[in-house]
A protein has these predicted regions:
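Sec/Tat signal peptide C-region and signal peptidase I cleavage site
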Residues: 17-23
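Alpha-to-beta junction loops
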Residues: 61, 83-93, 149-151, 173, ...
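A ligand-binding cleft/hinge motif common to bilobed small-molecule-binding domains
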Residues: 95-106, 161-171, 192, 196-228, ...
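Short beta-strand->loop
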Residues: 110-120, 174-178, 196, 209-241
């Protein structure tokens, strides 16, 4: 999707203030089923569960976490769509779930069939190589590819695969794109030497710090925190980005008071770095990124509507 995070980041303060009614008197009518689209034990799953623990302790709400993985969050959306919209069922996904993944699944649904509640953070998505490759820069990788080396490029979603294809096309290199399940599988593949390079969404941090991994580029619409000088995809000939933003959503037509109360509670926890979850978000994702209300709705819908443009570009 074209550069949507820059616009989103600029709107954060406006969007946060859009939730003007904190609905402090609202309480869930029962336990909240928290559906999580990510594998147990990962950073995103931990983030969701820590938010639940914090809200249980602070507000007395009760959460029942449940893993609903598969198809980049679409399995969760399909299971959630007919659930009660009274705040007792919410799900943690990424914006791509309601955007590219929902569009490409072709299940007859759009983001308008759900309630976007709030975002929490954006992943530090980068193009990362093993230090053993000897590539100290993106240019060195391209030189190797043009010299005939088979560049094995790991991706963990169809959308990222299309970005890798467009990147290779723009640079005149035919990457050997390897699709795996999850960012940890990309990390493991690069570390083991089964891949040369791949998209990683923050999991690369310790390896980069230790000198085992090398950042070649930012796959976001903004610089990476760990290497602000790394080139962006737009600098490398790609008009799309790999922004990955964590968010909560619910079934369609959630009452405004309910949506506002849940959004306020979650965003307060995510943005407070003195909380365990806030500290995790700061450490793993560089800090919170809060979008709510009309700004969030517009950003999600734009992500969805830009999907066929990316698909068409990758098919040419």
């Amino acid at each position: 999707m074209k550069k949507f995070l820059l616009a989103a980041a600029a709107a954060v303060s406006i969007a946060a203030s859009a939730v003007s009614v904190h609905a402090q008197d609202w309480t869930p009518p029962g336990p909240i089923k928290l559906m999580i689209a990510f594998a147990a034990g990962g950073g995103a799953d931990t983030q969701a569960r820590l938010i639940a623990v914090h809200l249980e302790e602070k507000l007395g709400w009760e959460f029942i976490p449940e893993q609903v993985t598969g198809k980049g969050g679409v399995n969760l959306l399909m299971e959630m769509k007919d659930q009660p919209n009274d705040g007792t069922v919410i799900g943690m996904v990424v914006m791509e779930s309601l955007g590219y993944n929902l569009y490409s699944a072709d299940v007859g649904l759009t983001p308008e069939d759900f309630t976007a509640i709030t975002t929490t953070a954006g992943a530090q998505m980068g193009i990362i190589a093993s230090a053993a490759t000897g590539w100290g820069s993106f240019e060195k990788m391209i030189e190797a590819g043009k010299a005939g080396q088979d560049i094995r490029f790991g991706v963990m979603s169809q959308r990222l695969g299309e970005l890798a294809y467009l990147l290779g096309k723009a640079q005149g290199v035919d990457f050997n794109i390897i699709s795996v399940k999850g960012g940890r599988a990309v990390l493991n593949g690069v570390t083991a030497g089964d891949m040369d390079v791949g998209f990683m969404a923050g999991i690369q941090g310790p390896g980069v710090a230790a000198g085992d991994l090398t950042i070649l580029a930012s796959a976001m619409s903004k610089p990476l925190n760990q290497d602000p000088d790394a080139p962006l995809l737009k600098d490398l000939g790609v008009d799309f980005d790999g922004d990955a933003i964590f968010m909560f959503a619910g079934p369609d037509d959630m009452p405004q008071e309910t949506r506002d109360a849940i959004a306020s509670a979650i965003s307060d926890a995510a943005s407070d770095e003195t909380t365990e979850v806030g500290a995790l978000i700061k450490r793993a994702f560089g800090g919170s990124l809060i979008l709510q209300g009309d700004d969030l709705d517009a950003t999600v819908l734009r992500n969805f509507n830009d999907s066929p443009i990316l698909i068409k570009a990758a098919s040419e």
